[in-house]
Regions:
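Internal nucleotide-binding/catalytic subdomain
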Residues: 165-258, 262
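Active-site "cap" helix and flanking loop/linker of ATP-utilizing ligase/carboxylase catalytic domains
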Residues: 237-258, 263, 273-319
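ATP-binding N-terminal substructure of ATP-dependent carboxylate-amine bond-forming enzymes
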Residues: 1-116, 135
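A short linear hydrophobic-aromatic micro-motif
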Residues: 127, 147-149, 182-186, 256-257, ...
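A conserved helix-loop-beta module that forms one wall/lid of the active-site cleft
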Residues: 101-163, 168
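Protein kinase-like catalytic core scaffold
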Residues: 208, 267-271
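Conserved small/polar residues in nucleotide/adenosyl-binding loops
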Residues: 320-327, 337
Length: 337
């Protein structure tokens, strides 16, 4: 094993990125601006990131020979999505470091582990029950009541892998509809709005957070993000401090997106994503340093940049041919005073 470890990457070093979609594309562009090369590993042909990266390997995540060659060709590996097979990580980790860490991935890939982790830190989530059988589903419904939401523990995103339960829902049919997988039932949260915080942590433990953004979703997909969010000063402080605590507890390196519900002035954590986040695209036009550069800085061992916001922002997300396009519009430029 020839594990490559380096606190600070030198100019011209290569950063490997798992996933070649839009986020991988933006990470590659940020890396290039900082003087780094990128190597994309992606199963699909001609992904967006391949157009701006130094190298591109098209292969499945179970193609261990190509994974090993990929990992041996780079100085560090990061990723644009969290549902990476464990076997792929095993191969890569023998060759070089992976940031963010596997612990962060492991927790974020499993909704049950994620909620237990958050609760252990002393923070609030929706009430929940583990569901591994039809009998456990019936018990969970009796305990949490309806409305409630039944979700797969793994591989769910953008509203996929979940179903809302009402008073007339049939547990037997619901159990069959989700494929009898490992599930989690979450109690209903009566919230006024949703927010997210994009935070980052460097190799030397420096933590920085962008201002919280207020998000609007439709059918489980992000539509708009508005900054500043509708929060009290204390809520804003709490959201940032909670994000910082999660980063510190995971010994995290890179950018993270933490999503919250605001319910009766209380912050309830929905989930976190161990990667650059769709609700953080506004930072490209609204901040001195955006989330993509911040992530590359962190995984490369550089100091974090200035995350200060220089204008109010409304980000509208449109979808064309199933690909997201963000238009970030400053809603008010700061005064010259």
């Amino acid at each position: 094993m020839n594990l490559k470890m380096s606190k600070v990457l030198s100019s011209g070093s290569t950063i490997g990125i798992l996933g070649g979609g839009q986020l991988g594309q933006m990470l590659s562009m940020a890396a290039a601006r900082l003087g780094f090369k990128t190597h994309i590993f992606e199963p699909s042909a001609n992904p967006p990131a391949s157009n701006v990266s130094s190298r591109f390997t098209q292969a499945e995540y179970d193609d261990y020979d190509k994974l090993k060659k990929f990992a041996s060709s780079v100085d560090v590996v990061t990723y644009e999505f969290e549902n990476i097979p464990t076997g792929a990580l095993d191969i890569i980790e023998k060759e070089c470091e992976i940031f963010p860490s596997r612990e962060a991935l492991k927790i974020s890939q499993d909704r049950l582990l994620e909620k237990k982790f958050i609760n252990k830190l002393g923070f609030k989530t929706a009430s929940f029950c583990e569901v591994g059988s039809q009998e456990e589903l019936i018990f969970a419904i009796e305990k949490l009541g309806t409305p409630s939401i039944l979700k797969t523990r793994r591989f769910g995103y953008d509203g996929k892998g979940q179903v809302k339960l009402g008073a007339t829902s049939n547990p037997k049919e619901i159990w069959k509809s989700l494929g009898k997988k490992e599930l989690i039932l979450e109690g209903f949260v009566d919230f006024s709005h949703e927010i997210s915080v994009i935070g980052s942590r460097s190799k030397d433990g420096q933590i920085s957070c962008f201002d919280p953004g207020e998000n609007v979703h439709k059918d489980g997909i992000l539509r708009t993000t508005t900054v500043p969010a509708n929060l009290t000063t204390q809520q804003k402080t709490d959201a940032v401090l909670i994000t910082a605590k999660i980063l510190e507890s995971l010994n995290y390196i890179g950018v993270i997106g933490v999503e919250f519900f605001v319910a009766n002035s209380t912050l309830i954590i929905n989930e976190f994503a161990p990667r650059v986040h769709n609700s953080g695209h506004w930072t490209q036009n609204g901040c001195t340093v955006d989330q993509f550069e911040q992530h590359i800085r962190a995984v490369a061992g550089l100091s974090l940049g200035n995350a200060e916001r220089h204008c109010d922002v409304i980000m509208a997300v449109s979808y064309t041919h199933l690909r997201a396009h963000e238009t970030t519009l400053p809603s008010r430029m700061p005064s010259s005073a």
